[in-house]
Amino acid sequence: MGYAITLRLDAAAATVVEAMWQALASRGVSDEALQLRYPPHLTLAILADSADPQLLVAAARQCAAQWPKLPSIFASLGLFRGTPSTIFLAPIVTSELLGRHAALVSLLAGEPVDPYYAVGQFVPHVTLASDLADSAAAVAALGLSPLPITSLLDRLDVVRFRPVEVLESHSLANI
């Protein structure tokens, strides 16, 4: 188990991403995202199970109090290569998104943040499927996906996983 702090996609964009998850499942590529039973999201930080959940909740509260909803455009598919690999939806990276990530990570100083989520290492993404043995099948299943996807990142959640348990969820203010 571990923890994550995530920005969730608005309902309209989430519906599009869930259809992409369904396409992957129906083609026999992966149903992992559907099995999570957690809405489409962009993870800002993953932390080890040894993290202090009270500190994570406090950091999320502080950020949520200052952050309005964030307009985002998911323009392309990406792939974290390897065996297994991960296919993801990539946003157009903005200074606002990177600034939010950096602000959150600074509040988590001393906590066991996964190195992939450190400032300067962070690759913003929405995971579509991971643990893929055949990334070509995933790309083929998503070939006709409606890109770009315009979204508002409208909630900030602190979750414990697996299974996913939302510890705290904050609606972000309107722009």
List where the protein language model places each region.
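Charge-rich, low-complexity N-terminal segments
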Residues: 84-85, 92-95
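Short proline/glycine- and acidic-rich turn/helix-capping motifs at secondary-structure junctions
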Residues: 75-84, 119-122, 156-166
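Basic, often amphipathic N-terminal segments
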Residues: 1-71, 95-152, 168-175
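Short beta-strand element of the conserved SAM-dependent methyltransferase core
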Residues: 7, 89-92, 158
